[in-house]
Amino acid sequence: MAAQGATAAVAATTSGIVGEGEPGPGENTSVEGPARSPGRVSPPTPARGEPEVTVEIGETYLCRRPDSTWHSAEVIQSRVNDQEGREEFYVHYVGFNRRLDEWVDKNRLALTKTVKDAVQKNSEKYLSELAEQPERKITRNQKRKHDEINHVQKTYAEMDPTTAALEKEHEAITKVKYVDKIHIGNYEIDAWYFSPFPEDYGKQPKLWLCEYCLKYMKFEKSYRFHLGQCQWRQPPGKEIYRKSNISVYEVDGKDHKIYCQNLCLLAKLFLDHKTLYFDVEPFVFYILTEVDRQGAHIVGYFSKEKESPDGNNVACILTLPPYQRRGYGKFLIAFSYELSKLESTVGSPEKPLSDLGKLSYRSYWSWVLLEILRDFRGTLSIKDLSQMTSITQNDIISTLQSLNMVKYWKGQHVICVTPKLVEEHLKSAQYKKPPITVDSVCLKWAPPKHKQVKLSKK
């Protein structure tokens, strides 16, 4: 997590990108292979007149998730949804990432003995079947990948004391996600996390956003009126990349402060550890869009500090949920490294990475390195790879370690590969070529003048 005093608009974590073929939020991919989920049962009809348990804040109940499975969930908050005229409860599924927290109707909670008994009986049957299956051990690496894919939340006991304290403080501040969904462009999107929209905007169950200027509104009527008045059809700033229907705009946070602040508030709905939103001037934003006759529709973005003391080439990165698993996340990652190459520097995303961010970055780094190792003939060092790719040596070492392609020998890391091993990895869907790649010929960009002066002095 970024330090509280940091002047960062989006500097807390890198998140919200799902690699192609990787599960999105809520999808369950087990290490053991697909199996019937525990607690999956159609809700039985309670007996007539059967009393219900009163829902109390802070208590734990069985709750039916959108995939029809039942899980223990803590009730965090309640509200009356004025837009839909009903009482709702905000629940956190015990042991799951807070991304899956949601507002639910009362009828999704097991509040009668009939419903609780039916769910319990089904769970016991599942556990009995599971116990009869042969035991299968998983490696530490498999467990890590399983936890990342399935959004398994780390317990405080698994964190170091400093991280645990910061995590508890962050969770207390952002515990309740009031904005449950947004409407932007042609999409209605479920929010994943709390975002600090100002005043009563932040307490609305649903917000409407203009996809061009990113103005947010409480009411559909206001939104429809705005669409008829708004003159924007693309992000502000300068278009620096165009190929086919893919376009990227460079937006300076100092020149377009309101737009960038609105972008940060939008992004926070899908990023957990993003702590600062309004001091956007130290950042440059790169907005990825899909272009058609109506205009340039925002797909995602990444931001970077104008001057990063830690050598980060990305402060925050996000692909909006409707566009995930289509190659845009890796395109944004690749684009950030193309800028680093033009600056003649190496860079790395700001840490910590989210679970989805780790998967996408590791997949991208692996593909880039495997492509070079497949075609290269001769001696190649980790420093050489770093200069060729603008990926830091630490990121290269950790990636090669995950591929079993590096050994520590006589005080240094040595690349140890065979053509067969490289080809085997490249056949894996995890390391296949991204569906959308950056064409450097179409990139019209040069480093800022003050950076060009520094480069000329090197």
From Swiss-Prot:
Annotated Low complexity bias: 1-14
An example Gene Ontology CC term for this record: kinetochore
Gene name as annotated: Kat8
Quaternary structure, from the entry: Component of a multisubunit histone acetyltransferase complex (MSL) at least composed of the MOF/KAT8, MSL1/hampin, MSL2L1 and MSL3L1. Component of the NSL complex at least composed of MOF/KAT8, KANSL1, KANSL2, KANSL3, MCRS1, PHF20, OGT1/OGT, WDR5 and HCFC1. Component of some MLL1/MLL complex, at least composed of the core components KMT2A/MLL1, ASH2L, HCFC1, WDR5 and RBBP5, as well as the facultative components BACC1, CHD8, E2F6, HSP70, INO80C, KANSL1, LAS1L, MAX, MCRS1, MGA, MOF/KAT8, PELP1, PHF20, PRP31, RING2, RUVB1/TIP49A, RUVB2/TIP49B, SENP3, TAF1, TAF4, TAF6, TAF7, TAF9 and TEX10.
Catalytic residue list: E350 (proton donor/acceptor)
Family: Belongs to the MYST (SAS/MOZ) family.
Domain Tudor-knot: from-to ranges: 55-110
Positions with a binding annotation for Zn(2+): C210, C213, H226, C230
Chain positions of all zinc fingers (C2HC MYST-type): 207-232
Signal peptide extent: none
Post-translational modifications reported in the UniProt record: Acetylation at Lys-274 facilitates cognate substrate Lys-binding and acetylation. Although considered as an autoacetylation event, acetylation at Lys-274 probably takes place via a non-enzymatic process following acetyl-CoA-binding, which primes KAT8 for cognate protein-lysine acetylation. Deacetylated by SIRT1.
Entry-linked InterPro entries: Acyl_CoA_acyltransferase (IPR016181), Chromo-like_dom_sf (IPR016197), Chromo/chromo_shadow_dom (IPR000953), HAT_MYST-type (IPR002717), MYST_HAT (IPR050603), Tudor-knot (IPR025995), WH-like_DNA-bd_sf (IPR036388), Zf-MYST (IPR040706)
Taxonomic lineage of the native organism: Eukaryota, Metazoa, Chordata, Craniata, Vertebrata
Stretches the record annotates as Sufficient for interaction with KANSL1: 174-458
Name the UniProt record assigns to this protein: Histone acetyltransferase KAT8
UniProt-listed PANTHER family: HISTONE ACETYLTRANSFERASE, HISTONE ACETYLTRANSFERASE KAT8
Region (Disordered): 1-52
N6-acetyllysine: residues carrying this PTM: K113, K274
